[in-house]
C-alpha cells in the first residue's frame, strides 16, 4: 500500500504569506468588470518588457484607440509601431515582437481573436500561446488569469520569482517556467483565479518595497518568518 505523504507544507506557507501581505498592504483586487479582453492582455505582455505597468497600460490603450482593432495594428510597419511605443523601455523590440506575434495569430486563426482558447484546457491554451513570438510563461499565464478568461494560473514576474527563490519555495536557479511548475501544484485549492491574481499583485508589491533585488529589507519584511533568507538574516 503506497505511503501517503500528506499535504505539501509549502501550501500552508503560501497561505501564511498571503495573510501577512494582506495585513501589511490591504486588498489589491482586480474587479471583474475591469478585466480586459485576452487580446489586450496579450499585447500588454508582449510590449511590456522592463516597463512600468502604467506605461504599458497607456501604450496598449493608445494602440487600440487609434487603430480600432488588433488586425489593423498588425498591418502597421514596425517603424510606425515603434514610434507609437515610445513609452516602452525598448520600443524597437516591443514593436518587432508585437508585429510578429499578431501576424502569427492572423496566419493561424484568420484574425487576432483568442476566443478559441476558452474551449481548451488551461494547460493546452497556455502551450498554444507559448508558440507565439515573444510569449513565454509569464505572458501565457497572464492572458489566462488576468483577462476575462479568469483561469487559475499564476503570473510570475521577476519580483515574484525572486521572493519565492529567497524563501526557498522554488529552486534557487528556477526560470519562470520552472518556478510556475513548482508553484502551481502547491497553490491552495480554495484559491480562485482572483485570489491567485491578488497573491501575485501582493508579492509584486513586496518585491518593490522590501524584497528588492539589492539590499532587501529583511528585518521588517512581513513574510520574514516564512522566508529562509529572512530567517537567516535575523539569526
Protein language model features and the residues they cover:
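Catalytic cores of DNA base-excision repair glycosylases
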Residues: 2-235
Amino acid at each position: 500500500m503506497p505511503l501517503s505523504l500528506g499535504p505539501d507544507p509549502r501550501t500552508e506557507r503560501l497561505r501564511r504569506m498571503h495573510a501577512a501581505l494582506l495585513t501589511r498592504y490591504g486588498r489589491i483586487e482586480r474587479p471583474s468588470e475591469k478585466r480586459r479582453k485576452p487580446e489586450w492582455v496579450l499585447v500588454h505582455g508582449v510590449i511590456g518588457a522592463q516597463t512600468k505597468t502604467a506605461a504599458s497600460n497607456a501604450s496598449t490603450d493608445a494602440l487600440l484607440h487609434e487603430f480600432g482593432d488588433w488586425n489593423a495594428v498588425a498591418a502597421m510597419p514596425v517603424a510606425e509601431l515603434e514610434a507609437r511605443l515610445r513609452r516602452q523601455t525598448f520600443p524597437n523590440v516591443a514593436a518587432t515582437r508585437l508585429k510578429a506575434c499578431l501576424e502569427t495569430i492572423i496566419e493561424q486563426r484568420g484574425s487576432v481573436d483568442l476566443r478559441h482558447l476558452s474551449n481548451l484546457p488551461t494547460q493546452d491554451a497556455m502551450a498554444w500561446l507559448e508558440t507565439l513570438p515573444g510569449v513565454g510563461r509569464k505572458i501565457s499565464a497572464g492572458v489566462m488569469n488576468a483577462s476575462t478568461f479568469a483561469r487559475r494560473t499564476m503570473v510570475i514576474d521577476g519580483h515574484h520569482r525572486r521572493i519565492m527563490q529567497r524563501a526557498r519555495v522554488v529552486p534557487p536557479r528556477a526560470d519562470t517556467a520552472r518556478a510556475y511548475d513548482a508553484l502551481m501544484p502547491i497553490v491552495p485549492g480554495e484559491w480562485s483565479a482572483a485570489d491567485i491574481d491578488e497573491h501575485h499583485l501582493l508579492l509584486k508589491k513586496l518585491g518593490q518595497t522590501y524584497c528588492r533585488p539589492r539590499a532587501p529589507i529583511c528585518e521588517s519584511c512581513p513574510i520574514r518568518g516564512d522566508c529562509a533568507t529572512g530567517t537567516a538574516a535575523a539569526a
